[in-house]
Amino acid sequence: MNKRLLILVLVLVVAMAASAALAACGTASTTTTTAAPATTQTTAGSTETTAATSPGSSETTATTAATGPATGTPIKLGFDEGFTGFMAYDCQQADEGIKTALAMINNQWMGHPVQYLFEDNGSDPVVAVDKARKLVESDKINVMIGPIFSPAAKAVADYLGKSSGIPEMTIVGQPADNLTTANGLAFIQTGIFDAQGYYFGKYLAEKGFKTANVINYDDTPAHALTAGFKKAFVDEGGGKVLSENYIPLDTVDFSSYLSAMKPADVTVDWIFGNGAVPFVKQYHDYGLKAPLAVPMSNNYTDAQLAELGDISLGMIACDYYAYTIDNPVNKEFVAAFEKLYPKEGGPNSEVYGAWQAVMMYLEGLKADGGDTTPAKVIPAIAGLKLDTPSGHVELVSFKNAYIPKRDFFILEVQKVGDVLTWVPVQTFSQVLLGDMSTTP
């Protein structure tokens, strides 16, 4: 009897020891991954994670701070964008900006882990709303980052206004038409295209250009930017547009347009993506001498400028950001980006815009004590005054949206060391980047 009792005691001791070991293991890092396009969820105490960039949906929860994992309710960031289709490259840039922001905060904020969830909408506005519905109603995101594509951003803001009311933080500029669905929740924090085009036209007129040819891919931003450009360059500056062409988005052979182009003082082009490099090369092959002026410098990345070589020198652009801006906040941002993406050169304005969208939302949470309720966090974001990588930014309530008062830059392609890149040559200081009514 005593022997059987002794055996029972020993069994209990072993079981208790095993239970304690399992409990200890429960505090260690755990990772569960399902390959895209299925959902990817990662929970880590000290593991650095990177969200997948293939199309589909992904959820990443990570707390990489050396101080240990955050334990509060997750803050969920949604990104509804065209990982496939003609906006895929732009989407990649924005994705890298979001990941840079998360890396800089060690994937946690105010004691809460930050989750990054994204969906591929193929840059289709109808699909974008379906994906937004999934992110909002199933994934329960707290904020929508993007979309970049203007028609998709307009449609998603309309859906958000009719559903959860969570804020939409834009990444790039948007046309004034998007104000019609802003619903008091859209933060167009990089500005309205119409005003951006206006300041570009103002600069070109002040530089003494009198005639211009305009050649654009036929999309919504092109029309908005050109309207602003013409107000300053033609209506106020007395200039003349000799030709104005809007061409299909997939065009890579520009010969029929270039051969008919009349001599002018400057050529304004809204050509991007796969067409950007061929356009500039063909422009020079046709012997056209007028300088190229590009609304928004992100249409030509450092990699594309390197491919073009010295023929890109002297190209002019406008934008709200360049990684060559000299201030301490930008130096920190650029260093963080280059640590994650050492082979890509410096961040462009889409990387910055996505980074700023994330940080602006999180700073709003800090201002309201961490309350993600739209009625609390939207006014908190609206009241922010921030020193950012592109300078001081304040938000202004405007036509049921929020637009920025910020510096706006004229840039020129110069060689910095051995690198061809965009360098600021003039600044419009603290201008309100709204629709035409906000221009001087």
Task: Please name every model-derived segment.
Residues 280-355, 366-368, 422-439:
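Extracellular/periplasmic periplasmic-binding protein-like sensory domains
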Residues 43-46, 50, 54-79, 107-113, ...:
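Immediate post-signal peptide segment of exported/extracytoplasmic ligand-binding proteins
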Residues 21-35:
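Bacterial lipoprotein signal-peptidase II cleavage site
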Residues 68-99, 119-126, 148-149, 215-223, ...:
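Extracytoplasmic "Venus flytrap"
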Residues 1-23:
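Sec-dependent bacterial lipoprotein signal peptides
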Residues 339-351, 362-422, 439:
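Segments of small-molecule ligand-sensing domains
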Residues 89-96, 103-178, 246-255, 277:
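Beta-alpha junction/loop-to-helix N-cap segments that form part of ligand/metal-binding clefts
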Residues 126, 141-245, 291-316:
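Extracytoplasmic ligand/sensor domains, especially the bilobed periplasmic-binding protein
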